Amino acid sequence: MRLTNLLLYILLSINLSVAAVATEKYSSLNHSLIYSYEEMFNFDIEAYLANQAPHLLPYAEVISHWSGYSSISPRVLLALIEQQSGLLTQQQVAAAVLETPFGKLSDKRGFAEQFQDVADKLANLVYTQSKQEGIAEFTGQIDPRLSGLDILFTADNTQAGWTELEIQQLEADKVAFTELYYRLFRQEYLPFKRQPDDKEMQVQAPNGFLQFPFPLGQSWHIGGAHTNTGSGSYPLSSLDMSMGGGWGSNQYNTWVSASAAGQFKRHSSCFAEIVHANGWSTTYYHLMNIQHSTGATVNKNSRVANPANTRGQALCNGGQSTGPHQHWSLKRNGSWYHLNGAYLSGWRITAIGYSYDTNCNRFYLSKNGWWGCAGYYRH
C-alpha cells in the first residue's frame, strides 16, 4: 500500500473543500483531525500518558510540541501510533519500537523524528497548495469514486489513480481506525463536516483586535510572511520578528508580548499559544523563559517570553533557526490563517507571494497612507 494511502484513512470522510479549512467560514469545530481549542485545554497529554502509557511520559513534551506546531490533534497522532506499532498499550516495549512508533508511516528514525514527520505529513495533506497567476490558493484532486474528498493523492509521485482494491482497503482502514480511536479515548472520531458555503471574502479579525507581538513603543524587524513550516505559499500565516543579536546575546530584556487577551497554552518550553475571542489564536515559537502555564489568563501586550538566545532552546524539539527571533502565527478555529488582509497594530498586511517573499509588490504593510516592505515597524 502506498504511503499516502496509509495516511489517507485518517481523512477518508472529509466532506469539505480544502479552502474551507483555511478560511474557517464555519462557526464551530465538529471533527477530530485539527487540534481544537477544546482539546487543547481539556485533554491533558501528560496525565493521559501517566495513566495509560507511562513508558511514553518522557515524550510528553514532544507530543505536545508537534501537535501544537502542526495543529494536528494529539489524540489522532496517538491513535495512529497504537494502530501502527501498539506502543501505547504494550506492557514491555522494545527499544526498536520506540525508534519507529509510526512504523511505515515514516522513514525517519527516533520517536521525536517520526512524530514530527507524520504530524507534518498530515498537515500537508490538509493544506494542499497550488499557484494560479501568482496567487496561492487551495486545490483538491478528486477521484470521483471517493465521494466528496478533497485530498492530495500524489504525495509519492507514482500514480494519481486508485484501484478498487485500494479503495476497499482504505474503507476498512477507516473503520478500524475509528474503532481504535473510540477504544483509546472513549469518544467518537468525527470527520470534517461541510458547512454552508460562504463565497464572500474571508472573515477578518477587526482592525484593532491584534497588536504586534512586542511591547508598545518598541520597534522590531519584521520579515516576509511565510507558512508555518516555512515552505510553500499558502496559507502565509506567519511572521518572523526580532530585535537583533546572535546566539549567546542577551535577550532577557527583550520581551515577546501577547497580541490580544486570552487563555494561555504552553505547548513546550519554546512554543506557546494564546486563544483569543471569536475563534482566533496566535502562536509564539523559538522562546525561552515562558511566563505562564496552560490555562492562565493573559492580557493584551502582557509579557509572554524572551526570544531564545541559544539554538538548542530555540529549537527545543527540533526544527531550524538562524538566530534569536520570534516566529509568530495566526490561527482561526485551530487552522492556520492566511495573513493577507489581516491587521496588526493598525497595519494592514498584504501577502500574495510565497514564503519569505520580500518583493514589495507582493509583501507590504500599510497604515494611514503609509506603506513599507520587510523592515522595522512600531505600533
Where are these regions (language model features)?
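Bacterial N-terminal signal peptides
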Residues: N5-N15
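N-terminal export signals and maturation junctions of secreted/periplasmic proteins
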Residues: A19-V62
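Non-catalytic cell-wall polysaccharide-engagement segments
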Residues: A20-S28, L105-G223, Y356-H379
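Short, functionally critical alpha-helical segments immediately adjacent to catalytic or ligand/cofactor-binding
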Residues: S64, G68-L88, V118
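Short glycine/threonine/proline-enriched tight-turn/helix- or strand-capping micro-motif at secondary-structure
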Residues: Q202-A205, F209, W220-A258
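Acidic, glycine-rich catalytic/binding loops that coordinate metals and/or anionic ligands
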Residues: P206-L210, N250, N299, Q320-H379
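A structural signal for short beta-strand/turn segments enriched in small hydrophobics and glycine
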Residues: I222, V256, G262-F264, G295-A308
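Zn2+-dependent peptidoglycan hydrolase active-site motif and core
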Residues: N250-Q291, T310-H325
